[in-house]
Amino acid sequence: MIRMDIVGITWAALMVVFTFSLSLVVWGRSGL
């Protein structure tokens, strides 16, 4: 159970980082 929780947290963190970096690239190309 603990391992599954770690995997879930890792996936959630990955999605947050991916979304953040993606929005950062979009903002950079927009000139903001």
Swiss-Prot record:
Q: What is this protein called?
A: Cytochrome b6-f complex subunit 8
Q: How does it sit in the membrane?
A: Single-pass membrane protein
Coiled-coil region(s): none
Q: Which organism is it from?
A: Pinus koraiensis (Korean pine)
Q: Where are the transmembrane segments?
A: 6-26
Subunit relationships: The 4 large subunits of the cytochrome b6-f complex are cytochrome b6, subunit IV (17 kDa polypeptide, PetD), cytochrome f and the Rieske protein, while the 4 small subunits are PetG, PetL, PetM and PetN. The complex functions as a dimer.
Which GO molecular function annotations are given, in alphabetical order? electron transporter, transferring electrons within cytochrome b6/f complex of photosystem II activity
Spell out the Pfam families in the cross-references. Answer: PetN
- SUPFAM superfamilies membership: PetN subunit of the cytochrome b6f complex
Biological function:
Component of the cytochrome b6-f complex, which mediates electron transfer between photosystem II (PSII) and photosystem I (PSI), cyclic electron flow around PSI, and state transitions.
Keywords annotated in UniProt: Chloroplast, Electron transport, Membrane, Photosynthesis, Plastid, Thylakoid, Transmembrane, Transmembrane helix, Transport
Q: Identify its protein family.
A: Belongs to the PetN family.
- Where can this protein be found? Plastid, Chloroplast thylakoid membrane
| BP GO terms, sorted | cytochrome complex assembly; photosynthesis
> Which HAMAP family does UniProt cross-reference here?
Cytb6_f_PetN
From what superkingdom does this record's organism come?
Answer: Eukaryota
| Gene Ontology CC annotation, any one | cytochrome b6f complex
